[in-house]
Amino acid sequence: MSQPTAVRLFTSESVTEGHPDKICDAISDTILDALLTADPLSRVAVETVVTTGIVHVVGEVRTSGYVEIPQLVRRKLIEIGFTSSDVGFDGRTCGVSVSIGEQSQEIADGVDTSQEARGDGHFEEDDRAGAGDQGLMFGYATNETPEFMPLPIAVAHRLARRLTQVRKEGIVPHLRPDGKTQVTFAYDADDNPSHLDTVVISTQHDPEVDSAWLEVQLREHVIDWVIRDAGLEHLATGEITVLINPSGSFILGGPMGDAGLTGRKIIVDTYGGMARHGGGAFSGKDPSKVDRSAAYAMRWVAKNIVAAGLADRAEVQVAYAIGRAKPVGLYVETFDTAREGLTDEQIQAAVSQVFDLRPAAIIRELDLLRPIYAQTAAYGHFGRTDLDLPWEATNRTGRLREALGLK
């Protein structure tokens, strides 16, 4: 069957938990979770670097708790599947170096006592905590999937999660932890997905694997499985270009193949390039860092806008100044998809009325002082159908509609 005519093609990618950058994200967030368990008020900024045979953990921390970082690092590496130098890393024998200092007192002072609280003494309790840095954060939602995520990144993540699942459960033998997925969807003139055009999977494997056998296995147990599981058969009726390990063999992977670094997969972590990004990474940061907490809040806002039926797509931006509680900017864009009779400015005013975007309020409303972050380190922070994440709640739809005078 021929494919429908495409107006444009859009591509997103994901990576597995064995990708070197994702190893680093997982280690950083595992350390963060352990510190929040020991002391929920911990201030954490932990970066990880992995390369052949060694893990470097660096950063700044303020906490009353104690965690055994090398033990956490090794446990996470083994959990991912790096148990032998043959597969690119051995979590049991690799070197682990730790160089963590104390959080800057000047930064701590600005977060503990905001500019508003340092004023004339007239301030609300949620004005007390200042933003941990300046910056801009975006959130996005669209009604093209049930989870209100862009379809390309949603499917790329499903493929990456399934690739890891078939490896760990032995459904497809001879796979190793490192891997990447990429999907290209065609969109029609109305900006709706019309068909799945291309799927790319690159996966690390044992030396004895035959490439033709591997393609058959991954088509059946990963690609076809995800298409059925996601209910995408109607978008996969034509010929799909499938590329499995298009560079050839992929035996050497993990940190032995490429060095990894925390925070280097920020588009994978968010919306797959379908929305703008403020540039700040998430992993290894406690929620006083608005790079993380405000980006989560913006996803919460955008998802509630779309779930409330106010627009088909929504992108929201917030901006902060370090040491100041109140945002310095808020912007709503619906790409001409707002409900008839509504403007972006009206929706923005409703958002300001319904959502308190001061850091202390975000942390309280989303209950962020909990060890919930390691589970987000791979396969995306948003639209996770396998996790119960507070920023995915659609619990403000009624209040948004009420603020706009809608029933």
Curated annotation (Swiss-Prot):
Its cofactor is Mg(2+); K(+). Mg(2+) binds at residue 21. Residues 108-131 are annotated as: Disordered. L-methionine binds at residues 60, 103, 258, 289. K(+) binds at residue 47. CDD domains: S-AdoMet_synt (cd18079). Coiled coil: none annotated. It is found in: Cytoplasm. ATP binds at residues 19, 178-180, 258, 264-265, 281, 285. Residues 103-113 are annotated as: Flexible loop. GO terms for biological process: one-carbon metabolic process; S-adenosylmethionine biosynthetic process. Homotetramer; dimer of dimers. This is S-adenosylmethionine synthase. It comes from Corynebacterium efficiens (strain DSM 44549 / YS-314 / AJ 12310 / JCM 11189 / NBRC 100395).
